[in-house]
Amino acid sequence: MGLKAAQKTLFPLRSIDDVVRLFAAELGREEPDLVLLSLVLGFVEHFLAVNRVIPTNVPELTFQPSPAPDPPGGLTYFPVADLSIIAALYARFTAQIRGAVDLSLYPREGGVSSRELVKKVSDVIWNSLSRSYFKDRAHIQSLFSFITGTKLDSSGVAFAVVGACQALGLRDVHLALSEDHAWVVFGPNGEQTAEVTWHGKGNEDRRGQTVNAGVAERSWLYLKGSYMRCDRKMEVAFMVCAINPSIDLHTDSLELLQLQQKLLWLLYDLGHLERYPMALGNLADLEELEPTPGRPDPLTLYHKGIASAKTYYQDEHIYPYMYLAGYHCRNRNVREALQAWADTATVIQDYNYCREDEEIYKEFFEVANDVIPNLLKEAASLLETGEERTGEQAQGTQGQGSALQDPECFAHLLRFYDGICKWEEGSPTPVLHVGWATFLVQSLGRFEGQVRQKVHIVSREAEAAEAEEPWGDEAREGRRRGPRRESKPEEPPPPKKPALDKGPGSGQSAGSGPPRKTSGTVPGTTRGGQEVGNAAQAPAPAASPPPEGPVLTFQSEKMKGMKELLVATKINSSAIKLQLTAQSQVQMKKQKVSTPSDYTLSFLKRQRKGL
């Protein structure tokens, strides 16, 4: 079974608009042909980003010239996707899969696939790959790369398995996505899960196993079960998001950026990005680079991504807030950037840090120890010289320099670090070390003592009583030891031990999940659709007037222990460094961590040229 007649009539594809028309036609069908669309995108990406030299020894391959916007009078060349080329690649893939999988050996009771069948399909893809190649290289995510080069990255393998299952008529097998990993769901209502690829640098994998153990660990890699369960249209969105326009470290293909942007708008208009927060963030980034007339602005799209995560995924996703923070950082909106980073830390605080979460660790490490210090350094420089951003540059916010005089900015900074410290509590792997402490002290020192003292840190007697118990040897070992890989598949992720006070700033997702406790209660800011607390909301003795500045309720034991140091007139750097790192060092000595592997690096996220 090859391409259908209606599909053939759309070829050849001579331009970006022709490719968009093909996608529109496929999205109009109940089952878009994932194999066809992936081959087309891979073909176009290869000749626009990998091999930009026009070959003269391939007579079937031609390039369509068109006027280039820059420089005026120049030409740009688009690789023509001829029917003969795409049909041959399509036939080769489908023949390879159907020839290797005998469906008669795998009965499908009730019309749903078995774990053995899914494992067999993944074996076919896995065994077809080259034995040795760099798994993190660019442009190896599509079926074009699989057919022509026998190379796929981690997410590409998972997508290839889903595409192969569709080619076999297994309509119940779909892609499942976290923010750094991919696997498949299958069975009645997609209730079953199966690993089909590796994660990180190594080839070690758990193919065929469920993801329940990872969910029970409360690791970010599996999002505590709040991962995306794709339908066919979302799988199309995934392949569009996976387009890599990078020609080299410093140059992107303008044509690929335009193609990706137009395809994402097509999916957006059809409603297929509603449950895809990272795709909305990707689209917002593209709109920031090249706005489309009559379309929502980037800030609106970033907030739509956050709303999607709250509505469908219990507000358990990190990257929607990271996208927003990156936008504000690039535009030097210091207060808004710090607030968004604080929100990312509020999300991560309910996870356990595991070795497979190294990608998000690197994100937080870069933000805390590079991006924020440099942003505050620039703000301090502007404050010293008296320069202020005004009007359109400030986009309605305070000037960058005056951010250091704003106690709410300082409160957001503290909330960010409180979330990181809370993330470490109960985790089998330590997070903080002296490198974090050095830059924390540096960032704290950017704020004058009188500004820091305007932030009121609430400490309730109930919290103090609770804090006395958990740090005994026996209790500490109980807190630190997270579920192991051998957890029973049926075990739900055990909740972290909550603080008695969830804080008046608790945001609540729009889904069925419980309210998320936040460490920050900064007046005038919102999260989860609720007003984040102000001084009037914080309990205080009846005779005391409410404080004027922002109010914080720390969730982590480390930040509770440092509360006096953080708002002191003079920064005691030695005491802060000792307090921030001491318990991490104890944890490293006492806890024997059983690590399944050293998994690292990214997936599903186009590398930015800079924040």
From Swiss-Prot:
Which UniProt key words apply to this protein?
Answer: Chromatin regulator, DNA-binding, Nucleus, Phosphoprotein, Repressor, Transcription, Transcription regulation
Extract the ranges annotated as region (Disordered). 460-553
Q: Does the keyword Zinc feature in the UniProt annotation? A: no
User: What happens when the protein's gene is inactivated?
Assistant: Homozygous mice die in utero at 11.5-12.5 dpc. At 9 months of age, heterozygous mice develop pancreatic islet lesions, from hyperplasia to insulin-producing islet cell tumors, and frequently parathyroid adenomas. Larger, more numerous tumors involving pancreatic islets, parathyroids, thyroid, adrenal cortex and pituitary are seen by 16 months. All tumors show loss of the wild-type allele.
Instruction: Give residue spans, biased composition: Basic and acidic residues.
Output: 484-500
Q: Which gene encodes it?
A: Men1
Q: What is this protein called?
A: Menin
Source organism, top-level taxon: Eukaryota
Q: Which InterPro entries does the protein's record reference?
A: Menin (IPR007747)
- Keyword Hydrolase listed? The answer is no
Region (Interaction with FANCD2) location: 214-390
Phylogenetic classification of the source organism? Eukaryota, Metazoa, Chordata, Craniata, Vertebrata
Q: List the disulfide bonds.
A: none
* Family matches, as PANTHER family: MENIN (PTHR12693:SF3)
Which GO molecular-function terms appear in the entry?
A: chromatin binding; DNA binding; DNA-binding transcription activator activity; sequence-specific DNA binding; transcription cis-regulatory region binding
Q: Which parts of the sequence carry Phosphothreonine?
A: T595
Which subcellular locations apply to this protein? Nucleus
